[in-house]
Structure formats: C-alpha cells, structure tokens
C-alpha cells in the first residue's frame, strides 16, 4: 500500500471516528447543544478534507494514465503515418506495374496463340 493510499485510509477512518463522536454527543447532550453543533462542524470539515484528498489522488491517477496513453497513441499515430506515406505509394506502384505486366503477357499470349493456330482472337479490353 502506498503512502498516499495509507493517508486516504487514515482520512476515511478519521471521518468515521468523528461521525461516531458526533452521534455520541448528540445522544448524550441532544441535537441543540453547543458541543454537538461544534462536533457537526468538525465532521463536515474532516469529511471535506478527506473528499478533497481523494479527488486530488483520483485526478493524479487519471492524469498519469492519460500521459501513458498519450505516449502510446503518439507511437501508433507515428506508425500509421509511416505506413500511410511509404507503403501505400509503394504498394500502389507495385500493383500498377503488376497490372501492366499482366496486360503485356496476356497480349503476347493472345498474339502467339493467334499466330500459331491461325485464329483471329480479339483482345477484349473490357476484361
């Protein structure tokens, strides 16, 4: 357990003890007594302090988590940009070259078959 968590636990226990003390004073002296009213103010002050510390700790944890996630998101964004800028253009160029090569091989094959077999094969550009 970290020191911050120990402090939070102590604060919660302190609030509980102050509430028990307030209930005791209320039963003993009544709700309108000066000590009961003073203890009620003490309970509110201690509870507010505990809630403030808890909120601070929660904010610190969330901020730390966001900083960790920010670094990971930035790395992923950098990878995506690299893939987008480099590999897409290279892949598109490779696919265009492959298509041109396939079209050339197809045209050569059709011409060879037409010449060898004395057939009049038409190259269909729509395919």
UniProtKB/Swiss-Prot annotation:
Residues 60-109 form a coiled coil. It comes from the Viruses. Signal peptide: none annotated. InterPro entries: Herpesvirus_UL96. It is found in: Virion. One of its GO terms (cellular component) is viral tegument. Keywords: Coiled coil, Virion. Belongs to the herpesviridae UL96 family. This is Protein UL96. The gene is UL96.
